[in-house]
Regions:
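Rhodanese-like catalytic fold shared by cysteine-dependent sulfurtransferases
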Residues: 28-80, 89-124, 128-167
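C-terminal catalytic lobe of FAD-dependent flavoproteins
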Residues: 1-30
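Structural scaffold elements adjacent to functional motifs in cytosolic proteins
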Residues: 83-85
Length: 167
């Protein structure tokens, strides 16, 4: 099934999802959907197609993520983790995780700072949602880090304590 709510063109998403369900589409099928769009009004890759592509990456192991609850469980188990907040300094100053293992390292500085980071820790980059966290994870993997997973949902979906104001 599918549920659709919110601003934007919900009817289109519902129609596409209903058609996919009716035809028995797999995640791989949906990732290949080529839907019509108008550049001034929508993106080239529909959000449903993008979601299917993200799922493909997760199922194949290309994208390895942890939920905020899994991150918290690792913390409670004493796992040696480093939470990398890869958002901009302005975003960090506005709101940040209140977590002893979280620190700011903006995405644009990850490549330069990676050689200074110990490689024996589990690195968990995150951002507002997930995209920059995923990108930072790929940068670290490209620099030889073996223990890297990004945090799904980022700050927006962190259900634990946050700090606000100047960081």
């Amino acid at each position: 099934g599918v549920q659709v709510a919110g601003p934007g063109n919900c009817a289109k998403r519902l129609d596409v999802a209903a058609a996919a369900i009716t035809m028995g589409a797999t995640v791989d099928d949906m990732a290949q959907f080529n839907l019509g769009y108008a550049p001034p009004y929508s993106v080239a890759i529909d959000v449903l197609v993008n979601a299917a592509q993200v799922m493909q990456n997760k199922l194949s192991g290309v994208a390895q993520a942890l939920t905020p609850l899994e991150v918290q469980a690792l913390t409670e188990q004493g796992e040696d983790i480093m939470l990398l907040d890869v958002r901009t300094p302005a975003e960090f100053a506005e709101v940040r995780l209140k977590h002893p293992k979280a620190f700011a390292l903006p995405l644009g500085r990850v490549r330069d700072k990676a050689p200074d980071l110990p490689k024996d820790k589990l690195y968990i980059p995150f951002c507002k949602l997930s995209l920059r966290g995923y990108e930072a994870a790929k940068i670290l993997e490209g620099q030889g880090f073996k223990r890297v997973k990004f945090m799904d949902g980022g700050v927006i979906h962190w259900p634990f304590e946050l700090e606000y104001g100047k960081g």
